[in-house]
Amino acid sequence: MKSNLRYGIRKHKLGAASVFLGTMIVVGMGQEKEAAASEQNNTTVEESGSSATESKASETQTTTNNVNTIDETQSYSATSTEQPSQSTQVTTEEAPKTVQAPKVETSRVDLPSEKVADKETTGTQVDIAQPSNVSEIKPRMKRSTDVTAVAEKEVVEETKATGTDVTNKVEVEEGSEIVGHKQDTNVVNPHNAERVTLKYKWKFGEGIKAGDYFDFTLSDNVETHGISTLRKVPEIKSTDGQVMATGEIIGERKVRYTFKEYVQEKKDLTAELSLNLFIDPTTVTQKGNQNVEVKLGETTVSKIFNIQYLGGVRDNWGVTANGRIDTLNKVDGKFSHFAYMKPNNQSLSSVTVTGQVTKGNKPGVNNPTVKVYKHIGSDDLAESVYAKLDDVSKFEDVTDNMSLDFDTNGGYSLNFNNLDQSKNYVIKYEGYYDSNASNLEFQTHLFGYYNYYYTSNLTWKNGVAFYSNNAQGDGKDKLKEPIIEHSTPIELEFKSEPPVEKHELTGTIEESNDSKPIDFEYHTAVEGAEGHAEGTIETEEDSIHVDFEESTHENSKHHADVVEYEEDTNPGGGQVTTESNLVEFDEDSTKGIVTGAVSDHTTIEDTKEYTTESNLIELVDELPEEHGQAQGPIEEITENNHHISHSGLGTENGHGNYGVIEEIEENSHVDIKSELGYEGGQNSGNQSFEEDTEEDKPKYEQGGNIVDIDFDSVPQIHGQNNGNQSFEEDTEKDKPKYEQGGNIIDIDFDSVPHIHGFNKHTEIIEEDTNKDKPNYQFGGHNSVDFEEDTLPQVSGHNEGQQTIEEDTTPPIVPPTPPTPEVPSEPETPTPPTPEVPSEPETPTPPTPEVPTEPGKPIPPAKEEPKKPSKPVEQGKVVTPVIEINEKVKAVVPTKKAQSKKSELPETGGEESTNNGMLFGGLFSILGLALLRRNKKNHKA
């Protein structure tokens, strides 16, 4: 009994121990698996390349007993399959040597995996793209000075975009254009601080939210900053001062505007932008035409400009000096300057070049940096005054061969000991100025001796001009509860114009004057006549005030100014001072200095005042006494008794075949004073002279043909007229009209023509009084009727009856239905990236990751094989050496880096863990079986 009991107790202990041991094995293996997975979950994968924000210059990852450095060089293979966990470069002063690690070493750190993603490349911009399993990393090249500056302070290259690109919702309205510096010309001279201006008018569509953005791109021959080192564009503000959108420059020629909260509750958004664009001297190095383009979406605004540059100042022998301010940093008070010195193969000796800040200098500053380069290239120097001095194939540094001295105000003095007369020289200056000064001016002076001690003395000045940009926008509040929905306003515009009617009529044209009183005085003047017909010449003077102004300078051929020039008899000598008018600078203020070019002469401005009186000019000419006999009666007929007529008849000489001379003066309050002159010759046919006064000019008809002749002198017409001859004069624009053979020819002249020859028919001269002119009739007894109405003059050939009908009903233009806009396909929005918290100062225990949506399992991410890397000794800090040999690459904004929230990946020990759990489970089952058996035995 006791034996069985002991056996049962032993079996009871064995069963309980088996159950306990199996449970511990299962629990222990589960915790080991979780810990193993947590060790590898410190890698954040970037889905696509994005612009990296530079972080601190030195960072370390520390654990309890060890220091972990993560190093990464800048040369990666395009076929690499490993995605680096982070791009951190760590540098400490205690590092005894440099270590280059081609791969990223991942170590165990007591930090959450999300913290590691906050570390970025310091000093180098890296673009990362990950198509499937291939990762290619290309560093962005920076100059050495920029890399040094990054170690001192944080530099942010580009703000990451979080909104949607809504460029397709921006409509460029009519009136958007690019205008030149001067309105009346397309010539732009950057050396005179001239620039072009982009004027945009935008209308934005619906559905724009805060954070959305749009871009537009400039052509490579312009940029937005001029000589300024700042890259900025104005904000778009509403009329009440609220910011609608902020602007930034991406790269060099891409402008982006990002909308703010103002647009949330607005509709019908519009904006206008006025942005100064400066000619880029690095790309437009020579004079000529340039096509400036700005592209927004599918809309391009462009214009061609003629770019000109100043050639500098030169003496009589061709020696030239030129210069240009290249960059200006108002924050640090620094600027740089290029200067050209061209000997032009002249024998110069003791050549000295000095540079001095004449306005805006800052006393007590450090010495500037001055470098002298000899141009050894085969091409000419850039007319834009720019040089890529690091090109050793074109420029040779000869600074050490010169004698260089500095003064206390940032100036320099440079002596050319061995001047190569066949080469040109470029001087690069980098110095300081007072950024609080209102003006900045830099002067370059060249002095040298020719043979026989003739001198070359040249001065060139460069100044700075400041420009400002502006932008404004507006919008209407959205209606929260609209009264009418789906209503589209329809704007209709009707324009009606009467049709233009043209008619031609052949035959007699009658003009009738209405019976308004006309008072005028008409005087005749005598002019010499040649031939057989010497008649009275009428001259009419209008009572229009004549303004006359002239300059009373004596001994001068100039109209406005007198320029006195004084020349030195010393060939090649003399002081020549020229100011290069202004260099562009982009700033919010508009103050600055404008200077002009001055050569070796004096310009005197005439300050005299001249007064010219405008008086009425009256001309009265009397005819001389006339002698002769008239063969036949002379009649004077005056009608209607409503006018006063003074007619002095002279003696008629010659033979008139028809013997009767009639003067008929017609009605309606006309005061006429006229005198007849000599009339001679023979008239074999009927001749009529008709004159209307539409614009005080006669019209002559010869043989039924209309001839319009324009000339300024008096023509002479000779010959015989065998048929009916008529002369008609209209005064449409003080020009006579001649008709010959049915062809219309317009002739302008200012004086009355002379008509000579024999007239075999009766001659009739008809003149109406519409414009203060008398009416004469010779050789006929028929009166002349003048009728004038308000109808326009009608001329031409009509062989049949003509009816003119005028329709006064305006044409009805049917409204054009509005064409619905088909919106373009929207671009795929980029999902926002959650912010990654910064790394804490102290390590925290790992926290298991919980899926956001329970019930939906997340497949584990595929683990990429890790290549072994060089081990790092514990307790030592390594310093990476970064070799940057690639050019600066523009950063393309893409999707932000974000951590993949997925299940923990499988580790290498998962299979052994499962076996252990199975073994523990079997132990527990065995223990339970023993306990059950013991219980049965105990009952038995």
UniProtKB/Swiss-Prot annotation:
NCBIfam families: LPXTG_anchor (TIGR01167). Interacts with host PLG; this interaction provides active plasmin on the surface of bacteria cells. Interacts with host histones. A motif (LPXTG sorting signal) lies at residues 904-908. Residues 908-940 form a propeptide. D- repeats lie at residues 681-718, 719-756, 757-795, 796-814. Changing residue 276 to A: Loss of fibrinogen and histone binding. Disruption phenotype: In a double fnbA-fnbB deletion, cells adhere to host (green monkey kidney Vero E6 cells) but cannot invade them. This is Fibronectin-binding protein B. The fibrinogen- and elastin-binding sites have been localized to the N-terminal region. SUPFAM superfamilies: Bacterial adhesins (SSF49401). The modification Pentaglycyl murein peptidoglycan amidated threonine is found at residue 907. Multifunctional protein which promotes bacterial attachment to fibrinogen, elastin and fibronectin. Also promotes the accumulation phase and the primary attachment phase of biofilm formation. In addition, protects against the antimicrobial activity of histones. Mechanistically, captures histones and prevents them from reaching the bacterial membrane and simultaneously binds plasminogen, thereby promoting its conversion to plasmin to destroy the bound histones. Residues 811-860 have a biased composition (Pro residues). It is a peptidoglycan-anchor. WR repeats lie at residues 815-828, 829-842, 857-870. GO terms for cellular component: extracellular region. Keywords: Cell adhesion, Cell wall, Peptidoglycan-anchor, Repeat, Secreted, Signal, Virulence. It is found in: Secreted, Cell wall. Residues 1-36 form the signal peptide. GO terms for biological process: cell adhesion. InterPro entries: Adhesin_Fg-bd_dom_2, Adhesion_dom_sf, Fibrogen-bd_dom1, Fibron_repeat-bd, LPXTG_anchor, SDR_Ig, YSIRK_signal_dom. Residues 764-774 have a biased composition (Basic and acidic residues). The keyword Chloroplast does not apply. Residues 36-111, 676-746, 764-878, 892-918 are annotated as: Disordered. It holds the Pfam family Big_8. Residues 38-92, 792-802 have a biased composition (Polar residues).
